[in-house]
Amino acid sequence: MEYKQSPLPANKAIALVAHDNKKQDLLAWCRKHLDALRHHQLMATGTTGALIERETGLAIHKLISGPLGGDQQVGALITEGKVDMLVFFWDPFEPMPHDPDVKALLRIAAVWNIPVACNQVSADFMVASPCFSTPVERLIPDYAAYMARRAQGN
């Protein structure tokens, strides 16, 4: 796979996702970092987004609920370059019927080289980083080169 440089902007598009047993934890994290989050474009899966928006007043673009395809919707947005960071508080103790979607979402985040926080401390580290509100260079798959190579049969 060939890679190319692709900047993450100073004002990032942040996807917020939480399993049912972690929604209150994510809400508490959003409250703690309210001022920092206001400067970014926020999106969330349906129920999580509605809760955060109602309880914090943050503007949240609400996607479909996770079990109905919201995790895959976030993944699609990552591949389109429309998500710069993922904060995903998942419950390691509770199996979910859409666990394959969760695994796919984490894989896509790794493929497209976006930062992922899976708990309060890792999310705190992201907000505390100077990279949270400054442009950052990263390498992503060069899809055009990939398609050109595939079209040639390689």
Swiss-Prot record:
Please name the top-level EC class of this enzyme.
lyase
Catalytic activity from the UniProt record: dihydroxyacetone phosphate = methylglyoxal + phosphate
- Give an example GO molecular function: methylglyoxal synthase activity
The MGS-like domain extends over 6-154
Classification via InterPro entries: Methylgl_synth, Methylglyoxal_synth_AS, MGS-like_dom, MGS-like_dom_sf
CDD domains per record: MGS (cd01422)
Q: Which residues form a coiled coil?
A: none
| Residues at the active site | D71
UniProt keyword annotation of Cytoplasm present: no
Taken from the record, one Pfam family name reads MGS
Tell me which SUPFAM superfamilies the record gives.
Methylglyoxal synthase-like
State which Enzyme Commission number(s) the record gives: 4.2.3.3
| Keywords tagged on the record | Lyase
Q: Name one GO cellular component term.
A: cytosol
Where is substrate annotated to bind?
H19, K23, T45, G46, T47, T48, S65, G66, H98
Gene Ontology BP term (one): methylglyoxal biosynthetic process
* Protein family: Belongs to the methylglyoxal synthase family.
What does this protein's UniProt record list under function?
Answer: Catalyzes the formation of methylglyoxal from dihydroxyacetone phosphate.
Give the protein name, as stated in the record.
Methylglyoxal synthase
